[in-house]
């Protein structure tokens, strides 16, 4: 009887093993078809199946290996949420809820914008980097940083670097992290500005989310406390009404003029909004928008995945375009190394390290939950990145370039734009551009850089294929814009608040009262500094002749990837101190790859002028030299002022790029020294800062 039972178990294991072998072969076949296909278009189902297979294998086997062979997660060990359960910051939470919270926090504009910009090089480079890079790098990054924070009482990334690498390194790293945070917030806000500029329908809808969120906050605070689902449903209904009302606002000439703003005006508005929102009580605006954006985000992404499977639209953008050489109009740089920093959050993101060492480690009820929350959430984010790539890829290539190319490249007139884009080898007529503009209810789609409009048009086209009625495209386009802007603005709110705390922490070392988090005046002062920091980059991006995204996104990518590299180095140091030298390779190898790519791209961004026009477009220093030459021959006063501003902006960007590289280099050198001492000399200094073992109740 026992023998029969054992044979049955062996048979079951064999069948499971065969099933996983089949999944691996199926994934390899689908990926091979995507890579070797030579036709004009290819069905997106090949991508859907390939990604499902690769993510399943990565989560089932690689994350399990990391969890129980490298990190050795222990559910008998109490987490910070259990040890310090205060009902406020530290609260043991069901892993499904924690997963939703963490995913909502990390899935910002990055996975939507990066792959859309990278589509100028074709679909294949992005697909390969997103699939392979996320499974072996990005998901690992989020998981291991979350583990490190759990074992250190839920401490932040900067605090952990200070504990594990020393006070001086921690202080410099904290400065670097703050600078990177400001760049991240600026680029998030830039995406919203580019989506809402000259769009009365879009601006009205987003403006209405503020009173809706305040109403939700008051309702939940004073009338129906803790009824999150109920108030979110009410908020969602009001949002749908706002979208419908926005259509009639855009059709009325007087109302349309009231709600139409250019990019620079919107930048000032978002700065003012970010300042006010970050000093208001969390329950009044931030929390209700967070609830609303979380439900909306998870719901829309889920529906989009199902819709893509159901419609199976063909990818029209080529497998590889001529712009892999870096001559493309959407962003500066060749496929190596700039594809990697452009896709950014869709594969690996340093910003996630701030979340994985922020609120999330204070919510985990068991250590094993970190596998689903850390690794699993990043799997979902990379799925979002693939969905964004699909939304860009199903568009006519000419239409894609009409939307994402800056005005300086294609001009203001539709006929001129169609002619220029056709000369690039992507034939499109002015009538096709005009028809899409009319279908989505906008006055223009030319040079709507930033990724959000492209994603929205792609989503609207998928819905159109389901319903077969082009009249629905306008509603769904603006619904997608609302969806993107809502959770991006929530990230701007939360990012400004987080950066304010970081500024106060740093200022407290200079003048102690400024570090008092309970001081209202100190909080306002720190918030002003924070908003001024990210607001500067936002405003300069709006007046940039190349659209801001062209120059700002690569700087964001470099800084964000350097932050990811520093976080992986921290975990490598921790694992070396724990004596897990072989296991440390799961973080050390991605760190080496990411930092190598990022240092190379960072160096290219500060190289002097050369005969290579592509490198000159990438380099801030080269641009400064070119602008200086123009300034010497310009007599027009207005043009001279514009050139002076541009020169100053490139100088700031170059200085920041060098600073971020120096910070990352310092962390790298100290990490190598600590790991070498641990491996060769068995010297652990600074000592491992892991909190003492406390048995779970």
Model-derived regions: residue spans:
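Extracellular loop-to-transmembrane helix junctions
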Residues: 41-60, 118-148, 158, 203-209, ...
